[in-house]
Amino acid sequence: LSSEKKNIIKKFSKKYNLPISIIAPYKKKHPMVSKFSLFSKKLATKNNTVNLLLNSGPLREHIADLSLQDNFPLIASSANLSQRGTKYRVKDIETRVKRCADIIINYGPCEIYKEGKTFDHNGLSLSSTQIDFRDMSIVRKGVYFKEIYNIFKDEFDINLALRL
């Protein structure tokens, strides 16, 4: 990504505590990427991009910091079956998914769940808003979509294109 786009990501993530997924190209020779097995790399990348979740809460941020400090890559799942909606509490995770886990940390419901922001007007479970930084397009509308869209428009003068 250009330095301008990197600065937008840094400024957004520091100034606003809104969960957002950034889709961006990755450096194939990056030390973290080079540690992936072929299987892991296939799971963690798509079309030469990675999807990084930012502002995902204190526990996940701390684990990510430890990962960076130790130069040990982590790949995380959404803890749900495909097309079954994001789970915000351990008790809502499907049993089939729980059986696959080596460890489950019940850190309690996240803030957006407590705020009642996890469902859209149709009652469907929302996840993070995904933005593809290659072309500044919305790949998925998620929690706080309107706020995120307006921040990019007002603060960064970027009209995010809807690719849905």
Protein language model annotation of sequence segments:
Residues L1-L164:
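Active-site-adjacent structural elements in enzyme catalytic cores
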